[in-house]
Amino acid sequence: MIDQIIDYNKTFVEQKGYEKYLTDKYPDKKLAVLSCMDTRLTELLPAALGLKNGDAKIIKNAGGLVISAFDSAMRSLIVAIYELGVEEIMVVAHSHCGACHMSYEHFYHEMIARGITDETLETICKCGVNLDHWLEGFKDTPESVRKTVETIKTHPLVPKGIVVRGFIIDSETGALEEIF
């Protein structure tokens, strides 16, 4: 698959397909969106929000969560605020999310089946990584949105005046419901 993508890319560049996407690094709407990496949202999310190329910084991860105050999603939001002029943040979870009810136990069995050893997992734990917490999903989507919004709003590096709001998007219709 990757080789096919590389071949496509060569044609894309040769035909100057990139020209209609040219923009600068600053989001025109001074907006960042933290959302799930679910494939159903790849085109639906920006379309349902009326966002075009260059309008917003879109940060995606499993579940659209900030799981700790200094994880990579939070780091990206801090960079968006201070380096890219973001003034508003939308946290957008979605219906029927695969991160809901994720568990380390499931991942553990999958990892072992694919050749990861217990010794490797034990070494990771001895290094201070709580895999159970790190790979844990959430049970309640609105509550996960609330927690993420609160983590962002109360973060010591987020300046006063940054607007943070939380939503759930229907992953079929694109309907947006404000949660927090």
Model regions and ranges:
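Divalent-metal-activated hydrolytic enzyme cores
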Residues: 1-29, 64-69, 81-84, 99-180
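Conserved beta-strand-loop surface patch within small alpha/beta domains used
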Residues: 15, 19-74
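Short beta-strand segments
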Residues: 34-36, 60, 92-94, 167-170
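Gly/Ser/Thr-rich loops at beta-strand to alpha-helix junctions
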Residues: 38-40, 95-99
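Short secondary-structure capping micro-motifs at structural edges
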Residues: 74-81
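Ordered, amphipathic secondary-structure segments that act as subunit-interaction surfaces
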Residues: 82-94
